[in-house]
A protein has these predicted regions:
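Interaction-interface detector
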Residues: 1-143
Length: 143
């Protein structure tokens, strides 16, 4: 099965549909995204260029099964299609975070949260992003 994201006029994903691979074969018998787009246009009354193929096995710029990643992430409803970078990405989690177009994921302006020590792990601690302080704050889930 192939998956296609239906885009709204603002490049937001408004639906994701599956398509039988046989419905996107070109004259040479090879899967072709444009054939799938044309099929979806005919059967869903939505312009072909507003259907973008997405891979269920792609996330964070990597293919879960070791294959070639397709477009950064599997497109979900509400995701944004970035045509310039050929990626789908989710909602920005915090105002200060920046998009890494290689991994199609958001990152804090100071990098990833620090690694937890064994003691912190045993205390069920974790780091939460503090947008006001632009910092990772250590918190305890049991508190």
């Amino acid at each position: 099965m192939a998956h296609f994201a239906k885009l709204g006029s603002n490049s937001k994903v408004i639906q994701v549909l599956t398509l039988n691979n046989g419905d996107m074969l070109n004259a040479d018998g090879k899967e072709d995204e444009s054939v799938g787009q044309q099929y979806l246009e005919r059967h869903n009354n939505w312009p072909a260029q507003m259907w973008i193929q997405t891979s269920y096995n792609t996330g964070g710029g990597k293919h879960k099964l070791g294959g070639t990643p397709l477009r950064g992430n599997y497109a979900g409803i509400g995701y944004t299609w970035d045509e310039d970078n050929n990626i789908f990405y989710g909602k920005k989690p915090h105002a200060s975070w920046v998009l890494n177009t290689t991994t199609a994921s958001w990152h804090s302006p100071i990098g990833d949260a620090p690694e937890l020590t064994d003691e912190e792990k045993s205390a069920d601690s974790h780091y939460e992003w503090n947008e006001d302080g632009k910092s990772w704050d250590l918190t305890n889930s049991l508190a």
